């Protein structure tokens, strides 16, 4: 199956090359467009299948290192990422998105179609973007080259798009003067020169006023390839003034003169236009007929300088259909009509297929003292029509393998190891000198339950677990096509239960033992649920039909008994309600003393539309105009969710108390809209008297593609929490009634967002006021913090059992290629200020989840759009991530 997928995708990608013309940077009829900030925007691959586009600017890298946590840049690509970000070794949560699988998949499709993809720096938000020193400028460029340029052997920093390489960088600087950008551009040029076999490009998007306050210095002192002027923000020089001279003077002629006297004298000059009437302020939009008059005039007047048209932005063009074609198509037709020597294309048909990379499976255990990630690329792909949203748990980052470290203890240890392989999964052998129970529920690869961790491009296997006492191991497996459980051997009684819900097929491996063995394998294909009978009387195993729900719960039950548990096992899938799926695994063991039964009950679900976060509202298509609400709810209820329980049965020598540390999040309102706050609190209780709980639910979820969501109401408000109803005026385009569940007091709680910041950036020229066009000097850079080792692993004593359950939850629709948060890791990147492609410090390439549970970032940057009206912020309400740590 893997080889056939590889063959199919290789054929599909190869077919793209002859169907699209080769990119010609010297052409006068190129069409550039911005993408990444459109409301409810389609995937990048959709626009790459449009033959009208030649250059696509992905926006934005919008947080600059001198003003950003950890001195890392940050990014925002609208709805195309899952919200996960990188965290440094110092524990600093950065703003650099790590879960942008769709973009990583789609860029190669664009490049195969002959299009150039540039990464845009800037945008209109946040307004504090600036560079404080020459060293900071060099280090900023070095970081971006290491993270998004060609894969360098010495680079130890993040790779948000994996091994995918962008074709260059765009500067859309909107704030705080032009200091440092010439240095950045010249640093990029030095890196470009180190890769002579590939052509990279630099572009800039100044306002039409001369000189532009932000980019004139960079254009004059560094060589850019493309200059697309925003002819829609300033009335005095806008493109509309070419049509109506009473508005001002269209100054394309003046810009040609400026370029000829600068380091960018060979740059192509583009006319920047809004792609619809709503993409900029009123009065700046030009009809196709008006554009044709302008293009024919200046293409004929400056045939060596005129480069084409730039549009803000892709979604606005897509929504502006004229005679059945998007605005971009009309612009391309105009350019080709006016160009006396247009480029030759062999065909206009581009297959609309979207490959999804699939890593090769791994069936061997890889013992390691820490989680290890190694780069061994072996990508494969499968085609999925881009016109239909498809939810998939297929890993999308090729070439990594992960392994969990071995666990050894003299006391009972419960281990849960999610495994998400590309096409197959295998659990590691579990051996013990005492009783061993193993339960391995298998969930199909097509499942989109929000409880399924997505580990991009990982062939994963768990390492052996050995113990001198009882060992309970639960290994949820999410395979692409098939799943199998590994042998379980023991010198004592062994009970094994493997409920399997396969995508295509499932098989159970042999279970061997020198004593009695109980084994049952209920297979649940689709929604038809058979039941099975275990080999040993006294136990039972059954499965009932599982129905998805929008209320995920996580429950851990520990039962302590003074007498040995019966030598039988029970595994069942229980219908909690008419719309809830429950996976239950019970693993009894028989140590010499009192037995311990660990029962992990996980209720996870997804609605019929596979939603995984609740969208309260979305920004409009203008990137800067007034916000319009397209999916707002009149009433929203949010509350924290975390459930834990423990019971003690039988006589014990001393009372049993349980200390529970609950880490939970709740939704609050800040001056800009919704915000997610993470809090931690501790409670100690006797299982026989009460339990520690924190429950939550979201009521009245919005309707999705499959219909309205079912309404669920929480039975009670958790102790220590209170419910409040308020009117939020900044959460959507219209006032919205919001029901919030908030903690009564924050006393004793710790916010996980409060992390110590590393040392501030160093370097000369702090906060300069005058721009400088000096070339980089190769200083030491602004990232000066020293590498910090990963946090120490929690030590488990012989009298303590620790079970950790992490269940990311949300109710927003999953998009093909995205997933939930990633496994934990640590990163520390200190790029060198010297353009050598090397980086000091160490980091892991595996992103970790953010401290907030953001599922798909909303557009925050307006970039090359109008700067007069308010920003168009899409609002996303996300439900909670629960991390409960139970200590007995």
Curated annotation (Swiss-Prot):
Its EC number is 3.2.1.14. Glycans are attached at residues 622, 780. Residues 344-617 have a biased composition (Low complexity). A lipid is attached at residue 863 (GPI-anchor amidated glycine). Residues 338-631, 743-799, 813-855 are annotated as: Disordered. It catalyses: Random endo-hydrolysis of N-acetyl-beta-D-glucosaminide (1->4)-beta-linkages in chitin and chitodextrins. It is a lipid-anchor; GPI-anchor. GO terms for cellular component: extracellular region; plasma membrane; side of membrane. This is Endochitinase A1. The gene is chiA1.
């Amino acid at each position: 199956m893997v080889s056939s997928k590889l063959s199919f995708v290789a054929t599909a990608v190869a077919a793209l090359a002859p169907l699209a013309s080769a990119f010609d940077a010297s052409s006068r009829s190129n069409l550039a467009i911005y993408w990444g900030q459109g409301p409810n925007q389609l995937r990048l691959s959709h626009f790459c299948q449009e033959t009208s586009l030649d250059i696509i600017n992905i926006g934005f890298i919008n947080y600059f290192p001198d003003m950003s946590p950890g001195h890392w840049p940050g990014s925002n690509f609208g709805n195309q990422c899952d919200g996960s970000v990188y965290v440094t070794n110092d524990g600093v949560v950065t703003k650099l998105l790590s879960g942008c699988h769709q973009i990583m998949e789609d860029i190669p499709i664009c490049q195969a179609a002959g299009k150039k993809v540039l990464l845009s720096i800037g945008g209109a938000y946040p307004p504090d973007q600036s560079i404080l020193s020459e060293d900071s400028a060099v280090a900023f460029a070095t970081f971006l080259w290491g993270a998004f340029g060609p894969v360098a052997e010495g680079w130890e920093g993040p790779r948000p798009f994996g091994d995918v390489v962008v074709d260059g960088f765009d500067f859309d600087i909107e704030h705080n003067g032009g200091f440092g950008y010439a240095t950045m551009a010249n640093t990029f040029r030095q890196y470009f020169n180190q890769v002579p076999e590939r052509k990279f490009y630099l572009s800039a998007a100044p306002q039409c006023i001369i000189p532009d306050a932000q980019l004139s210095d960079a254009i004059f002192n560094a060589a850019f390839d493309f200059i697309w002027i925003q002819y829609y923000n300033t009335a005095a020089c806008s493109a509309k003034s070419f049509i109506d001279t009473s508005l001002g003077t269209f100054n394309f002629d003046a810009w040609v003169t400026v370029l000829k006297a600068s380091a960018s004298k060979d740059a192509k000059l583009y006319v920047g236009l809004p792609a619809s009437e709503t993409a900029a302020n009123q009065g700046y939009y030009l009809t196709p007929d008006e554009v044709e008059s302008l293009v024919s005039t200046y293409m004929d007047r400056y045939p060596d300088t005129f480069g084409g048209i730039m549009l803000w932005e892709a979604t606005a063009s897509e929504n502006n259909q004229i005679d059945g074609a998007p605005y971009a198509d009309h612009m391309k037709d105009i350019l080709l009509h006016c160009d006396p020597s247009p480029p030759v294309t062999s065909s206009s048909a581009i297959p609309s297929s979207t490959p999804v990379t699939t890593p090769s499976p791994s069936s061997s255990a890889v013992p390691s003292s820490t989680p290890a990630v190694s780069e061994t690329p072996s990508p494969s792909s499968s085609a999925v029509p881009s016109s239909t949203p498809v939810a998939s748990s297929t890993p999308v980052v090729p070439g990594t393998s992960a392994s969990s470290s071995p666990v050894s203890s003299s006391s009972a240890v419960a281990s849960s190891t999610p495994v998400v392989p590309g096409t197959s999964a295998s659990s590691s052998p579990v051996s013990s000198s005492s009783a061993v129970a193993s339960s391995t529920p298998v969930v199909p690869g097509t499942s989109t339950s929000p409880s399924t961790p997505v580990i991009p491009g990982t062939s994963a296997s768990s390492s052996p677990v050995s113990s001198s006492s009882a060992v309970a191991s639960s290994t949820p497996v999410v395979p692409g096509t098939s799943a199998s459980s590994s042998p379980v051997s023991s010198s004592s009684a062994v009970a094994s239960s493997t409920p399997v819900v396969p995508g295509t097929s499932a098989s159970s491996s042999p279970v061997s033992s020198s004593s009695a063995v109980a084994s049952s394998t209920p297979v649940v294909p689709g929604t038809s649920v058979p039941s099975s009978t275990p080999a040993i009387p006294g136990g039972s195993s059954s499965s009932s039909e599982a129905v998805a729900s929008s209320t995920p719960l996580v429950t851990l039950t520990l039962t302590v008994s003074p007498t040995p548990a019966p030598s039988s096992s029970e595994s069942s899938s229980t219908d909690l309600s008419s719309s809830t799926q429950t996976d239950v695994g019970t693993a009894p063991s028989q140590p010499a003393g009192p037995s311990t039964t660990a029962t992990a009950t996980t209720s996870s679900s997804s609605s019929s539309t596979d939603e995984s976060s609740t969208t309260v509202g979305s920004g409009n298509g203008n990137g800067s105009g007034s916000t319009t609400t397209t999916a707002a709810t009149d009433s929203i209820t949010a509350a924290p969710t975390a459930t834990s329980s423990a019971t003690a049965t039988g006589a014990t020598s001393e009372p049993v108390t349980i200390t529970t540390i609950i880490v939970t999040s709740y939704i609050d309102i800040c001056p800009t809209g919704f915000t997610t706050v993470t809090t931690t609190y501790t409670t100690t209780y006797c299982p026989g008297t009460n339990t520690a709980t924190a429950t939550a639910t979201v009521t009245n979820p919005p309707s999705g593609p499959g219909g309205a969501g079912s309404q669920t109401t929480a039975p009670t408000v958790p102790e220590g929490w209170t419910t409040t109803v308020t009117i939020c005026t900044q959460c959507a385009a219209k006032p919205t009634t919001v029901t919030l569940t908030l903690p009564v007091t924050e006393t004793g709680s710790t916010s996980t967002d409060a992390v110590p910041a590393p040392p501030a950036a160093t370097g000369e020229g702090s906060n300069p006021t005058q721009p400088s066009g000096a070339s980089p000097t190769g200083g030491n850079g602004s990232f000066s913090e020293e590498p910090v080792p990963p946090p120490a692993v929690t030590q488990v004593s012989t009298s303590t059992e620790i079970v950790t359950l992490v269940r990311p939850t949300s109710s927003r629709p999953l998009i093909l290629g995205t997933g939930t948060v990633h496994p934990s890791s640590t990163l520390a990147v200190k790029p060198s200020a010297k353009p050598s492609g090397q980086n000091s410090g160490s980091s892991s390439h595996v992103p970790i989840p953010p401290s907030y549970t953001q599922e798909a970032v909303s557009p925050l940057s307006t970039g090359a759009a109008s700067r007069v009206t308010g920003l168009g912020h899409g609002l996303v309400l996300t439900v909670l991530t629960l991390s409960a740590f139970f200590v007995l």
